[in-house]
Amino acid sequence: MQPTVTLALLALIFGLTASAHHSAAAFDRSKPYEMTGTVHSFLWANPHAWISVDVPDGKGGSDTYELEGPGLNGMARSGLTGHTLRPGDKIKVVVAPYRDGSKRGEFMAIFKDGQQLKF
């Protein structure tokens, strides 16, 4: 009986860890907003894509936002690649902001050249 209980507890612990990794609790999806800026960098790496976007700050400078995206498998099935976005591209992004107010978030939609990139 002891090995069964131990095995069940381990399965529960590892299951909770995996669930926490895929949690969207850090993002406030109830307050999405749009931003327009220039791609600083685009990282196509497992488990998620990342975009750094330079957004004008209204004072002549810019702020860089770090945006996390969905898993690569889904994006690739939609035809996106690691070369879809390049530094210097002008994009509009719909973002779910981080709850802590930092310049980070989750990209929910991307528009490039007036067209929405599907993923």
What are the residue ranges of the model-derived segments?
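Short nucleic-acid-contacting surface segments enriched for D/E, G, S/T with interspersed K/R
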Residues: 77-92
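Bacterial N-terminal signal peptides
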Residues: 4-17
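Conserved hydrophobic positions within beta-strands
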Residues: 35-39
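Short, structured beta-strand/loop micro-motifs enriched in basic residues and often containing a Trp
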Residues: 69-77
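Short aromatic-glycine-enriched beta-strand elements
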Residues: 45-56
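A short macromolecule-binding patch
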Residues: 58-70
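Short boundary/loop segments of OB/S1/cold-shock single-stranded nucleic-acid-binding domains
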Residues: 18-33
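OB-fold/S1-family single-stranded nucleic acid-binding modules
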Residues: 98-119
